[in-house]
């Protein structure tokens, strides 16, 4: 397919971008945002969005996690144009690239034996090995200058050897980041990095570069935490004689205490599938994620997917970290309140038929679904969802807060009982009101309201006393939709039964 012409001076070729997660956990919000920004950039410039699973850490990777990533991306509507590809499938290409560099004198075999076990952690030993390869210390490695023929003889004799890249003695690694500007790091600060371990296993920096070259990636869009790796990867690109792609590093997403948002520390609130299961609209979460680190340059916050594509640019990505303001104390605000507000706005604006389908999924998850909702009571379900949609922020709220509309088995809010059922006269008034409503011929909003007000006048009590008490009796709650809308929604039998049942709650 012919790609459309590009008008952005930063884009001079057909765009090919990739999202490259490691399947060591579920798709989290940071990964979801990275995938989204890559997807938006590709769509903006008529490019190709590729999914590559970087599964070379076999001990931590799993099929379950791979499927979790695929499910999360599909739910967000970020299906790739190419892939998924699996990095573990390209091991031979990675090794071939490293051996090519050795033959060209740009890398060397390192026969240094692994350290014997001691009290240091693996991380500490790795750091020590890296320090031994930095700056002038690199020259002290006897294998850096070992004759190629001698190195090959020892390898063919079966002696274990890692392959290291020869970092130039002088100069600096430099690249222009599309978010953070020019980045420079002196070669003396970069170790002769390992490309292939002595057991033949290719390491990350080599694998990712070889894969990006093979997939013709033009722009690498990823988290700021990769900035250090990028200097090393630029060296590998240059050693392989390949074009260096444009880089754009995205600001980190931080928790309220300005610590890095972590799936390990912050749990399910970081998982994309949590938002699916708890009743978010996919486009609402996409909209929210887009604004974590990017701004359209206007006050507009609610944007359709098409508007996001039209407005998105890497130049407008912020340099400062994005704050994800969730609360671990308030179960109602279990995630960022702005995300909940945004989802509520999407729910209110979406077609009722579409919202009903999403609510139906939640009713099934909470065992509240009745087959009649798909047939004879379909119209009732739609009316009920429409009645409640302005009050709820997620579709799960319909099955939790809205449970009294779909089941007779619900809990009464203790505060609502104290507020609305404290008048001892209600012990007699509620059953009598139930009998009066049972006789209403046309069970409509106006007819039931007239019956209640007539009864309150006969008994010499304020209508508000009965209205508030009836709301709690019918829903277990102190607030909600108009009380007579509730009455009509529940219908005559349930209204009468619940009013009588609630008399037992009056002190």
Language model features: what each stretch is:
Residues 17-24, 51-55, 214-220, 270, ...:
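Glycine- and acidic
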Residues 67, 231, 306, 431, ...:
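A generic structural signal for well-ordered alpha-helical surface patches
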Residues 241-412, 475-507:
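Catalytic adenosine-cofactor/nucleotide-binding cores of aminoacyl-tRNA synthetases and other
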């Amino acid at each position: 397919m012919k790609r459309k012409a590009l008008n952005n001076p930063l884009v001079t070729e057909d765009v090919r971008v990739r999202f490259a997660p490691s399947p060591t956990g579920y798709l989290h919000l940071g990964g979801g945002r990275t995938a989204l920004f890559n997807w938006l950039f590709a769509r903006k410039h008529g490019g190709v969005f590729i999914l590559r699973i970087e599964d070379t850490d076999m001990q931590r990777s799993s099929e379950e996690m791979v499927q979790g990533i695929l499910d999360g991306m599909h739910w967000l509507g970020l299906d790739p144009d190419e892939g998924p590809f699996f990095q573990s499938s390209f091991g031979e290409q990675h090794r071939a690239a490293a051996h090519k560099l050795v033959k060209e004198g740009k890398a060397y075999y390192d026969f240094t034996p692994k350290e014997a076990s001691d009290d240091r952690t693996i991380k500490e030993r790795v750091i020590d090995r890296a320090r031994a390869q930095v700056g002038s210390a690199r020259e002290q490695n006897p294998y850096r200058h070992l004759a190629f023929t001698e190195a090959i003889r020892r390898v063919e004799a079966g002696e274990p050897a890692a392959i290291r890249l020869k970092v130039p003695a002088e100069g600096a690694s430099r690249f222009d980041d599309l978010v953070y500007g020019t980045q420079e790091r002196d070669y003396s600060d970069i170790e002769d990095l390992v490309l292939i371990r002595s057991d033949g296993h290719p390491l990350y920096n080599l694998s990712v570069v070889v894969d990006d070259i093979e997939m013709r990636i033009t722009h690498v869009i990823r988290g700021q935490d990769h900035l250090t790796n990028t200097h090393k990867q630029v060296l590998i690109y240059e050693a392989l004689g390949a074009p260096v792609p444009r880089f754009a590093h995205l600001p980190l997403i931080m928790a309220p205490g300005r610590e890095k948002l972590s799936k390990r520390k912050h749990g399910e609130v970081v998982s994309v599938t949590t938002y699916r299961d708890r009743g978010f609209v996919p486009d609402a979460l996409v909209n929210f994620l887009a604004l974590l680190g990017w701004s359209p340059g206007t006050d507009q916050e609610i944007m359709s997917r098409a508007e996001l594509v039209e407005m998105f640019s890497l130049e407008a990505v912020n340099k400062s970290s994005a704050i994800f303001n969730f609360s671990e104390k308030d179960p109602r605000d279990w995630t960022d309140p702005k995300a909940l507000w945004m989802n509520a706005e999407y729910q209110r604006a979406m077609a009722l038929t579409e919202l009903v389908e999403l609510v139906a999924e939640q009713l099934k998850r909470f065992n509240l679904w009745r087959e009649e909702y798909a047939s004879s009571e379909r119209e009732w379900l739609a009316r009920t969802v429409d009645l409640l949609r302005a009050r709820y922020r997620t579709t799960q709220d319909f099955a939790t807060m809205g449970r009294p509309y779909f089941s007779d088995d619900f809990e009464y809010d203790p505060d609502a009982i104290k507020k609305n059922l404290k008048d001892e006269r209600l012990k007699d008034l509620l059953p009598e009101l139930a009998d009066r409503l049972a006789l209403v011929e046309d069970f409509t909003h106006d007819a039931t309201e007239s019956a209640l007000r007539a009864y309150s006048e006969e008994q010499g009590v304020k209508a508000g006393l009965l209205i508030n008490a009836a709301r709690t009796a019918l829903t277990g709650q102190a607030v909600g939709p108009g009380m007579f809308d509730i009455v009509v929604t529940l219908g005559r039998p349930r209204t009468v039964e619940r009013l009588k049942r609630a008399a037992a709650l009056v002190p």
